[in-house]
């Protein structure tokens, strides 16, 4: 499949989805998109800018959710035009799907909603590439049912995304077997390196996180041979309005991406060991 002008999957080099969890302001969106576009261009990594206009599943009613669909889409359109990069954003059950699909290149469905049949069908009917996040409660082989629903709309541009699985209360773990298992769906497989280190509800009224493990899990995922890496980043994660504890510090990303590119090339240049 293709996103904008580049191929995804089938042993192609990994692509990156990255940006702040939520659109905090137009200035921050432009600054982060510009920086990430420059870094990925220098490294030769295909890039999709990610940020959300609404975070509908925040822990607390008092948490910052975003700038709303109208302002958010206006900013994403400006990012896309200014830096010539594709963009991805989350959609929810009450999102005006057609309106969002006119602007973005990829629609992303939240993990909590992966079993909502009507929601998945309506998103996929927009005819855009869709990144479906696997629920924290779902076995990797059960994603085949989700993919079958999605492709029943005639949309073959479906990706599946691992973002950790619930491990008791307020904790997630990443089963790297999941990435290999989900390849059986025939869809490109994406690893969400930052939500996988989230501690859901770990700070009481908001989620915590362990960003120090993002590099570890990212490298492990590269060893599996993934098609895409999802990594939320922020200029100052400790001041982020959403998911700061598990966001990657933006100004440290270039050196790390360079390492991941080397790992990706090494793994994909080797024959698969069949047992």
From Swiss-Prot:
Its main location: cytoplasm. InterPro entries: Aldolase_TIM (IPR013785), DAHP1/KDSA (IPR006218), KDO8P_synthase (IPR006269). Keywords: Cytoplasm, Lipopolysaccharide biosynthesis, Transferase. GO terms for biological process: keto-3-deoxy-D-manno-octulosonic acid biosynthetic process. It catalyses: D-arabinose 5-phosphate + phosphoenolpyruvate + H2O = 3-deoxy-alpha-D-manno-2-octulosonate-8-phosphate + phosphate. Its EC number is 2.5.1.55. Pathway: Carbohydrate biosynthesis; 3-deoxy-D-manno-octulosonate biosynthesis; 3-deoxy-D-manno-octulosonate from D-ribulose 5-phosphate: step 2/3; Bacterial outer membrane biogenesis; lipopolysaccharide biosynthesis. Pfam families: DAHP_synth_1. One of its GO terms (cellular component) is cytoplasm. GO terms for molecular function: 3-deoxy-8-phosphooctulonate synthase activity. PANTHER family: PHOSPHO-2-DEHYDRO-3-DEOXYHEPTONATE ALDOLASE. NCBIfam families: KDO8P_synth, PRK05198.1. This is 2-dehydro-3-deoxyphosphooctonate aldolase. It comes from Francisella tularensis subsp. novicida (strain U112).
